[in-house]
């Protein structure tokens, strides 16, 4: 759970870093982050059901996918476009 909490802290700051490069991706990453904090609160109060655990892991995976898509959009596409224009 420590790794999840560490990722949650890093993920919470991600929209701030993405805002200058791509506002749509930054805004799309906010709802999963909010939901992950809600599920984390339920986990810490021991009131999270097995379904809640599954949803929390699904949100974690969704946020990882969004982060990778954002990294590709921000860093990968410009690099590919630069190499294609040569």
From Swiss-Prot:
Primary site of residence: membrane
Role summary: Required for proper spore morphogenesis. Important for spore germination.
Record organism: Bacillus licheniformis (strain ATCC 14580 / DSM 13 / JCM 2505 / CCUG 7422 / NBRC 12200 / NCIMB 9375 / NCTC 10341 / NRRL NRS-1264 / Gibson 46)
Family stated for the protein in its record: Belongs to the YwcE family.
Keywords tagged on the record: Cell membrane, Germination, Membrane, Transmembrane, Transmembrane helix
Subcellular locations according to the entry: Spore membrane; Spore outer membrane; Cell membrane
Keyword Transmembrane helix: yes
Transmembrane portions of the chain: 1-21, 25-45, 55-75
Protein name listed in UniProt: Spore morphogenesis and germination protein YwcE
Gene Ontology cellular component terms for the protein in this record: outer endospore membrane; plasma membrane
Topology with respect to the bilayer: Multi-pass membrane protein
């Amino acid at each position: 759970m420590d790794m999840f909490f560490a990722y949650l802290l890093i993920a919470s700051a991600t929209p701030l870093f993405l805002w200058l490069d791509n506002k749509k991706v930054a805004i799309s990453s906010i709802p999963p982050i909010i939901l992950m904090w809600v599920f984390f609160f339920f986990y810490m109060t021991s009131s999270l059901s097995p379904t809640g655990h599954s949803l929390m892991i699904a949100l974690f995976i969704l946020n990882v996918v969004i982060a990778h898509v954002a990294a590709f959009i921000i860093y990968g596409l410009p690099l590919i476009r630069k190499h294609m224009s040569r």
